[in-house]
C-alpha cells in the first residue's frame, strides 16, 4: 500500500478532504445505516480465529489496525498472511535490502500485535496480476482449512477505482477461497494431509476507494495499539515521510513536523495521514475514531426453520 503522494496532492490542492486524499475511502450509503461495532468486555471470542490477508505489510495496520486490536482483545487468535514480498517499498534501499527490511518489519508487527504466526506467500510486489489467481486461491484454502479460520480481514474484492493490482487480486482470491474452503470437492487431496472442509463465516473488507459500508468499528479504545502497529512498518513509513518531504521540497515547501528527528517525523506523519482520517470517519458516526468495512457475516437464513423443526437423533 503506497502513501507517497498523500501530502503532495493535498499541498497542491491546498485542502485535505477525503476526495483529495488518496486512500480515504468514500462510503456509499447502504439501504440501512451501518452497524456500529463497539468493544466488548471480557473475551467473548475466545477460541475463534481470524486471518489478516493482505498483499503488503502496512495494509492491515493502516486500514484495520484498530479492529485487529479489538478482535485480539476479545479473545481471537490471529494470523497474518502476507501475499507479496514488499520488494518495492523503501526509500533508498536496493531491491534485496527492501525485501529483507520489510520481512523484519513484518516480524516486528506480528510480535507487537500478539499474532500467533505469519505466513509469507512471497509473490513479487506489484506483480500479482501476472500470477494465477487459482494458485493463490488454493494456497489460501489450504491455510483456511489448516488454521480453521472463522474471520478474515482483507481488501474489498469489489472496491471501486483501485489502482494497485496487488490489492484487487488478493481480495478476489480471498473471497473465492472463503467460499471454496467449505466444499468437499474443492481440492480433496488436502484431506489426505489431515485437513477438513472449513467455512469462513465472517469477512471484514476495507477499501481505499468508494465502498458499500455496512459496518463501522469504534477504534477509540484501541487507537494506541493501532498506532503501534503502524509504527512497526518502519521501512514503509520512512519511505512515506522522506518521499513526501522530497515532493514538498520540489515545490519549495516543507512541513516542519516531518523534518525533525526520524521517530518524531514518522509519528507526525502517522497522525496526519492516518489517524486524522480515522477521526474524520468517526465523526460521521458520532465516534472519536472509527474504521469502515463492508462486512459479510454468518448465514442465518435457516436458523428459524432449524429452531422450529430440528430434533435430536
Residue map of PLM features:
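Active-site rim/loop-helix segments in enzyme catalytic domains that contact anionic ligands
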Residues: 3, 7-9, 29-147, 302-306, ...
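N-terminal export signals
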Residues: 5-27
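C-terminal accessory domains and tails appended to enzymatic cores
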Residues: 7, 33-37, 42-46, 183-196, ...
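Structural signal for conserved beta-strand scaffold positions within catalytic alpha/beta enzyme cores
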Residues: 52, 82, 120-122, 154, ...
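Histidine-centered active-site/metal-ligand motif
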Residues: 56, 164-167, 233
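Internal alpha/beta domain cores that form substrate/cofactor-binding pockets in large enzymes
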Residues: 79, 118-203
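Residues on a specific face of well-ordered alpha-helices
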Residues: 104-108, 171-172, 176, 224
Amino acid at each position: 500500500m503506497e502513501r507517497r503522494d498523500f501530502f503532495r496532492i493535498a499541498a497542491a490542492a491546498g485542502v485535505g478532504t477525503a476526495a483529495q486524499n488518496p486512500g480515504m475511502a468514500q462510503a456509499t450509503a447502504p439501504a440501512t445505516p451501518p452497524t456500529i461495532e463497539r468493544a466488548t468486555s471480557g473475551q467473548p471470542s475466545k477460541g475463534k480465529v481470524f486471518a489478516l490477508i493482505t498483499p503488503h505489510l502496512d495494509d492491515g495496520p493502516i486500514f484495520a489496525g484498530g479492529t485487529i486490536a479489538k478482535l485480539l482483545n476479545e479473545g481471537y487468535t490471529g494470523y497474518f498472511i502476507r501475499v507479496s514480498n514488499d520488494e518495492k517499498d523503501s526509500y533508498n534501499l536496493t531491491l534485496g535490502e527492501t525485501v529483507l527490511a520489510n520481512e523484519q518489519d513484518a516480524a516486528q508487527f506480528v510480535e507487537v500485535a500478539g499474532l500467533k504466526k505469519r505466513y509469507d506467500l512471497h509473490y513479487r510486489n506489484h506483480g500479482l496480476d501476472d500470477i494465477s489467481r487459482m494458485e493463490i486461491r488454493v494456497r489460501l484454502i489450504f491455510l483456511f482449512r489448516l488454521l480453521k479460520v472463522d474471520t478474515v480481514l482483507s481488501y474489498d474484492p469489489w472496491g471501486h477505482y483501485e489502482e494497485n493490482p496487488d490489492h484487487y487480486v488478493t481480495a478476489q482470491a480471498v473471497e473465492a477461497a472463503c467460499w471454496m474452503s467449505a466444499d468437499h470437492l474443492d481440492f480433496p487431496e488436502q484431506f489426505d494431509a489431515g485437513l477438513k472442509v472449513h467455512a469462513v463465516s465472517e469477512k471484514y473488507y476495507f477499501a481505499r476507494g468508494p465502498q458499500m459500508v455496512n459496518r463501522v468499528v469504534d477504534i477509540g479504545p484501541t487507537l494506541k495499539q493501532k498506532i503501534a502497529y503502524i509504527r512497526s512498518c518502519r521501512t514503509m513509513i520512512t519511505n512515506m515521510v522522506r518521499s513526501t518531504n522530497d515532493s514538498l521540497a520540489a515545490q519549495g515547501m516543507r512541513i516542519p513536523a516531518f523534518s525533525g528527528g526520524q521517530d518524531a517525523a514518522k509519528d507526525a506523519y502517522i497522525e496526519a495521514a492516518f489517524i486524522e482520517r480515522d477521526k474524520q470517519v468517526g465523526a460521521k458516526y458520532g465516534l472519536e475514531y472509527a474504521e469502515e468495512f463492508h462486512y459479510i457475516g454468518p448465514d442465518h437464513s435457516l436458523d428459524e426453520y432449524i429452531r422450529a423443526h430440528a430434533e435430536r437423533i
